[in-house]
């Protein structure tokens, strides 16, 4: 379990490195933006974005809001978005994009606490996935439900 590809991004801050990672989900190459601290990773925050397509896309500034010097922060783009293969699927295949990413992170950083933050669409994604994952906490932020 690992990333297929890691591409360094041209974003410079003193405490973290930014990479666009690619990982395999359902035989598709799915991408995410990840900021990894230069120091030991003690905590992981998985930011599940809202919106569809380019609306609500994952941005470095949003990830930076959740970081400290020992926190890895990652936001999956979801299939069909920002160079990820496949078709954007609300609450179907995109759930697998989240679960596989968390499984990879847990295998790479087994001692780190994993926290999920889901906004809008990501809020419901988190509700549908967090109970089956090695996650220590979950925050739903304005999730839509019926």
What annotation goes with each model-predicted range?
Residues 128-146:
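Hydrolase active-site cap/lid region
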Residues 89-108:
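Alpha/beta-hydrolase active-site loop
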Residues 80-91:
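Glycine-rich "HGGG/HGxG" loop immediately N-terminal to the catalytic nucleophile
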Residues 57-75:
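Short amphipathic alpha-helix adjacent to the substrate-entry channel of hydrolases
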Residues 42-51:
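Short beta-strand element of the alpha/beta-hydrolase
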Residues 118-128:
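Glycine-rich nucleophile elbow surrounding the catalytic serine of serine-hydrolase chemistry
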